């Protein structure tokens, strides 16, 4: 090995242009490796972020948001169940699943079992789901064992509410779920004003009714 290294070093000294090319190539490999390593770390390293928002229109409300799991690509069902058990300890008022929970690489069994795991999270007012571009959009299920309607049926079977241009009014809050912008098809998503009009009159704020 040392002999090969010395021969390589001698060649680079005799031909400077190759030394520049070699150095540039090594630098590119190192940068790429660091970039991929950083991405892999972020995929596998789940971080909880807390936001404390103030409003005089609602009493204390704990909302748990989960997004971009890309099941089986970045997270196994076993890992997800462990996190769901931990999140249950938060005793959230409601849980929102905001897209790309699944993608085209998620096996059917993992989609089904992940839906069960997510449904097991302890909450007071329900679990709500909106599609992302990998759930029901431009990248959705191109080579998958299942489609968006299978996702909907499985989630709803487990008691998770799918919101696609729909409104749910709870005692102290209105939840609006929009259709993903990347998948309009022949049925464009509703505007914000149209969705607001779907809120029952007795659940609207004074600003909206005026």
Segments (PLM) and residue ranges:
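Hydrophobic alpha-helical transmembrane segments in integral membrane proteins
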Residues: 32-56, 73-78
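Short, charge-rich amphipathic segments
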Residues: 9-24, 48-55, 79-92
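Non-catalytic terminal accessory segments
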Residues: 1-43
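Soluble catalytic domains of enzymes that build or remodel membrane lipids, polysaccharides, and related
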Residues: 57-210
